[in-house]
Amino acid sequence: MFDIDGVIVRGKNVLPSAPETFQQLYDHGRGAWRVPAIFVTNAGNTLRQQKADQLSNWLNVPVTEEQVVMSHSPLKMFTEYHDKHVLVTGQGPVEFIAKSLGFRNVTTMDELRCWFPALDCVDHKRRRAAPCSFNQFFPRIEAVVLFGEPIRWETSLQVRTISLHNHKTNPCERGTRNVDPMKYISAFTAAD
């Protein structure tokens, strides 16, 4: 088991001894690893195949998707959530990552912010003057999936908090798009 970050690469730079070491672990004549090899990372901003391709390029040995374990890889086992409406946030192609793990009903943080601009009381510069057009009966968010740290973590945290406080009523129901988020949170806290 090989950690990627800090062991094979530091930042974007491959550590000088890494390619040479992995050349010794891979038998090019047989086209097979001399020892079982798996690569792990706490990163969650890319797909396993992309990380395998990157490792193959860095180390000059073939690395398959099955040999890569990302921070989000275990979510594939949470099949009870795959049909639920999930809010996904993080960096990279979060919607594509979620769907590749089996989640079928996905809303991204950017989509939610666009549909309900009043929910984002942190980032006023990115707030839209009016919500995007959307289905009047926005489905209840039933789970939140975080793929690593979002770039704008404060906005993501604030909007996720509102979503998590939403276990009795949907914050995205018709007529709540322009509600004051703090009054909204207070209403749910008081009702608990």
Briefly describe each language-model feature range.
Residues M1-D192:
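HAD-like aspartate-dependent phosphatase fold
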